Amino acid sequence: MTDFAARLKQVASNPEVFKQFGRGVERETLRYRQDGHLATTPHPEGLGSAFTNKWITTDFSESLLEFITPVSHEIPELMGQLKDIHHFTQTKMGEEKMWPLSMPCYVGSEDDIQLAQYGSSNSAKMKTLYREGLKRRYGSLMQIISGVHFNFSFPESFWDALHGEQDEEARQDTKSDAYFALIRNYYRFGWMIPYFFGASPALCGSFIQGRETDLPFEKIGGTLFLPKATSLRLSDLGYTNSAQSVLKIGFNSIDQYLDGLSDAIRRPSEEFAEIGVKVDGEYRQLNSNILQIENELYAPIRPKRVTKSGEKPSEALQRGGVEYIEVRSLDVNPFSAVGVSEEQVRFLDLFLTWAALSDSDPMDNCELECWRDNWNKVIVSGREKGLMLQIGCQGERLSLQDWAHRVFADLRQIAVEMDSAAGGNAYQAVCDKLESWIDEPELTISGQLLELTKEHGGLGKVGCALGMKFREENLAHSYEQYSADAMETEVATSLEKQKQAEQSDTLSFDDFLEDYFAYLKQ
């Protein structure tokens, strides 16, 4: 019996483990107008305060909505919450719709992309200033690419099954070590996520005007595409950050990770210093370091812990260890009215469990770069049959198809146990469906979307057609987990909380920022 099989057997000895995963979704979507152009209106009043509403906020721009579900332990509950949030939001948007694709709708100029506004409190102004810094550093277009983040945690019963009873400190160390082992395996094998679920093989030609690229794009009308691409969102054209390539952040332990993050947050950037921080009395960015704050670190997966008030993400990890992980490699699913499907969630259950139960040796920077090369190959040409990927840095290679089939042999073992615990065969059905996609790349989401793009004569037309369909679907939805009253109560509560935040400030904005960044001088 392999180590993986032995660990799976230990965990499966308590079937309740598989019913207790913690899951949450954060979904981003642009508001757009009837004509397919980006909406330039403020955040809809009926949604309350984007600063304090726990379900509905904004990301980079006023027009970039972000929906956040609480932690759920049942997939139907999670999907129901997400559908309820979409339904309520659409009822407050008038004729505007939600863009169903990761790559943006038509944007006339970067000036149309208005920074998200959160009110007049110091914390709110800091959020907008951070976005001003992002705009000046990378341009606004890159910042309105939409994605889906999937938050995931194992229950205490999972750790009990593998490690028996432990005191609090030992359990905390066990969890952190195991989540970092999972993260290393995610870097090794997570390219399967863009292979199956990448949904950005094409983009609007205006998106790369003035940007240099070596990619051999083909054209349909105003749309540029790569015939075998899966996720241009994850490529150098999308939401990545070349300025961060000098950073060496390791994933072998929580201490190594936090040391790397601490260095990154303090490292100055000559390029960003040229922008200036406060010029003629106006702030341009929070500071001129490579990262203004920790959130600027680009990563396809992050170790996380819920923060206390005023606490930075790294301080929360230092205090209590890793509590959950955030998967950040999902494009918006263009075939789901809520941007993600139940099948995707089930696959992630399987894949993340496999990544945690499989062997995961320490990884140096050289090896990490080799795995990143595999990701880049899959992102740009993943649907090319026979695509060869590297096995570490030793020069060995294996085809994407062979490698994926090998992983699925393990995933199927997990699926049997999960289905046995839950009743039914939902997990095995997901394995059946996705494994067929390994040998038929045209069935993947990027393959299907590119085919639609060709049929419609461009990406914008596909986006508008799907957006209209999903608007009707979301409006027709009946509440499953929440109610209109619960949503309206949260709107009112959020407005009150924003007001309280604005009334409780005692410092000037200058002093507030100096106080916040005092830790950089330590």
From Swiss-Prot:
It catalyses: L-cysteine + L-glutamate + ATP = gamma-L-glutamyl-L-cysteine + ADP + phosphate + H(+). Gene3D superfamilies: 3.30.590.20. Pfam families: Glu_cys_ligase. The keyword Nucleotide-binding applies. The gene is gshA. One of its GO terms (biological process) is glutathione biosynthetic process. Pathway: Sulfur metabolism; glutathione biosynthesis; glutathione from L-cysteine and L-glutamate: step 1/2. GO terms for molecular function: ATP binding; glutamate-cysteine ligase activity; metal ion binding. The keyword ATP-binding applies. GO terms for cellular component: cytosol. It comes from the Bacteria. Its EC number is 6.3.2.2. Belongs to the glutamate--cysteine ligase type 1 family. Type 1 subfamily. Keywords: ATP-binding, Glutathione biosynthesis, Ligase, Nucleotide-binding. This is Glutamate--cysteine ligase. It is an enzyme of class 6 (ligase).
